[in-house]
């Protein structure tokens, strides 16, 4: 389909910007001359908090795209937020650092889950269904190309001009991705569908009230402790924040019909493996950089 090249390039440029930033983030934080001069523990803690939130927001961004904004609008909003975040990260100021991290976290939530969903909707057309796997293979090639090439740009720009040039390159790359996406919008306009809420769907406010709000409240509890229980207060906050989410899935499993329990159990097992995989994989921005 004509949509594929545009979505391929949009995702390639988005991953170019994201992994360029990830590759230099902790190095930037620890640089005593041109960065923030944080020690290893502080930099790793901030990086870990950032990555955890990056993985949290797609849940919210996907919900909003499904039921409120639509996929195209969400992708454009996400791309713009991330591009601004990368550029603002070039400013050596703690306030701008936290602002840029917030923009990237929010932008990722809007962009990441929705561009792959939009591609899937394009391939749901009867004439393309048989080629869906091939389409996703090509799409993921774009991810790998962007994630690979960005490292050479990041290293070269830092050596020639400094950190700011590398972050600007990430931002410009992201904006190129947004531009490509907008240019190709006519090819996937028909696939941008806001899903009607069915009787079996949990209302958006109920999701926020029964999962996200309790997670936030539980996450705030460790901030009142004098000393961290596990490593740091941010680690404690995320562990406590996971408690309501785990209980929700246990409740979901127990409440489900007997015929659905094996499928839900298999899904939860996959979740556990995926969590372990990404926890190891994301060492590429902290431990692997240190080595």
Question: What are the roles of these predicted feature ranges?
Answer:
Residues 22-23, 59-60, 144-160:
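A gly/Pro-rich, aromatic-decorated transmembrane alpha-helix motif that marks the paired
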Residues 29-30, 64-66, 153-162:
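Interfacial helix-cap and linker-helix signal at transmembrane-aqueous boundaries
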Residues 110-126:
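Intracellular juxtamembrane helix-capping segments at the cytosolic ends
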């Amino acid at each position: 389909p004509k949509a594929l090249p545009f979505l391929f390039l949009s995702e390639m440029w988005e991953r170019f910007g994201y992994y360029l930033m990830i590759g230099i983030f902790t190095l930037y934080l620890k640089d005593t001359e041109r960065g923030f001069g944080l020690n290893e523990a502080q930099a790793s803690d901030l990086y870990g908090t950032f990555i955890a939130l990056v993985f949290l927001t797609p849940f919210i961004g996907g919900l909003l795209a499904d039921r409120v904004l639509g996929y195209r609008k969400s992708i454009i909003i996400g791309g713009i937020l991330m591009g601004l975040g990368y550029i603002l990260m070039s400013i050596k100021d703690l306030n701008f650092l936290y602002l840029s991290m917030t923009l990237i976290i929010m932008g990722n939530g809007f962009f990441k889950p929705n561009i792959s969903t939009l591609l899937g909707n394009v391939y749901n057309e009867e004439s393309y269904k048989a080629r869906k796997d091939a389409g996703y293979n090509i799409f993921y090639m774009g991810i790998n190309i962007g994630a690979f090439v960005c490292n050479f740009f990041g290293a070269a720009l830092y050596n020639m001009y400094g950190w700011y040039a590398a972050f600007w390159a990430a931002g410009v790359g992201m904006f190129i991705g947004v531009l490509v996406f907008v240019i190709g919008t006519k090819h996937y306009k028909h696939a941008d569908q806001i899903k009607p809420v069915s009787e079996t769907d949990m209302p958006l406010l109920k999701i926020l009230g029964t999962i996200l709000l309790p997670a936030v409240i539980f996450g705030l509890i460790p901030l009142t402790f004098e000393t961290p229980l596990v490593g740091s207060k941010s680690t404690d906050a995320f562990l406590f924040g996971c408690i309501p989410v785990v209980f929700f899935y246990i409740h979901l499993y127990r409440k489900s019909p007997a015929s659905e329990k094996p499928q839900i159990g298999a899904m939860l097992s996959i979740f556990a493996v995926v969590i372990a995989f990404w926890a190891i994989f994301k060492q590429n921005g902290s431990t692997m950089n240190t080595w």
